[in-house]
Regions:
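Residue-level marker of alpha-helix boundaries and capping positions
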Residues: 76, 175-176, 205
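A donor-sugar binding/catalytic signature common to diverse glycosyltransferases
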Residues: 194-198
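A short, acidic, amphipathic alpha-helical segment used as a generic capping/interface helix at domain edges
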Residues: 51-52, 56, 172-191, 210-213
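Residue-level signal for short, function-critical loop segments
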Residues: 73, 201-202
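Conserved small/polar residues in nucleotide/adenosyl-binding loops
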Residues: 221-225
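Glycine/threonine-rich flexible loop motifs
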Residues: 204-210
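Short, surface-exposed basic-aromatic patches at helix termini and helix-loop junctions that form
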Residues: 86-91, 190, 212-220
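A charged, amphipathic alpha-helical module
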Residues: 1-168
Length: 225
């Protein structure tokens, strides 16, 4: 997230990528020793990462086009699957807006509670999902607090993403990436993106119906996308 936020504006080319590699190395070593996975350690790491990236000198006055990337999970994140779309946009000097992996995990977990609400039932999976969602939301708030305290824009929280899905009336569409793709599109348009690249597998019917089918409704969030 911070790489996408800062790299188009950095004064020293490559400085943001160096920070990413540094923290990837540090976190890998911590995970190898079974550390950094508890809530207290994660909150400390959130703060340290944000403080580290806040030292990068940037020129925010640059005119940079903000483009969102969303779509089916594998195609969205895998350069092999999307033909290095992210690199292509970055080479064009675009500010890439892309949600991370955690919202997808929250979406999958929350699918149990959505099904319970739709069918008027109460299952053990649904109850457990609510507890897990609450835990992840707490960590998400801590992460956003660290971002804001260091002068960065907070990431869109899951509650906001879900509200977009509710507006479409499609929270029951939980096969594959379901309503999440459309919600990410709305989030991107609301947060200033003038274009959205939707990456979908050619033969994935679920992605085409849940995502492409609501493009017109997503465009209601902006008039010039």
């Amino acid at each position: 997230y911070l790489y996408n936020e800062l790299s188009p504006y950095e004064l020293k080319k490559g400085e943001t990528l160096d920070k990413v590699r540094l923290w990837n190395s540090r976190l890998s070593r911590l995970f190898e020793h079974g550390k950094a996975a508890d809530p207290i350690s994660m909150c400390v790491i959130f703060r340290k990462i944000c403080e580290s990236f806040a030292t990068i000198n940037c020129d925010k006055s640059r005119s940079v086009k903000k483009v969102a990337v969303t779509g089916e999970l594998y195609i969205k994140f895998c350069a092999l699957g999307n033909g290095e779309t992210e690199k292509y946009l970055r080479d064009l000097g675009c500010h890439i807006y892309m949600s991370g992996f955690v919202p997808y995990i929250m979406y999958l977990t929350d699918s149990c509670t959505n099904d319970d609400n739709i069918y008027g039932r109460k299952t053990l999976a649904g109850v457990g999902a609510k507890v897990l969602i609450a835990y992840m939301k707490t960590l998400w708030c801590k992460m956003n607090s660290a971002l804001v305290q260091n002068g960065f824009e907070p990431m869109e929280d899951y509650r906001s993403l879900k509200s977009y899905g509710e507006n479409f009336g499609c929270l029951g569409e939980t096969m594959g990436d379901g309503w999440l793709i459309g919600a990410e599109m709305c989030s991107a348009l609301k947060n200033g993106c003038k274009g959205v690249v939707m990456l979908l597998p050619f033969g994935c019917l679920v992605s085409h119906t849940c995502a492409r089918g609501i493009i017109k409704r997503c465009l209601l969030y902006t008039s010039d996308a």
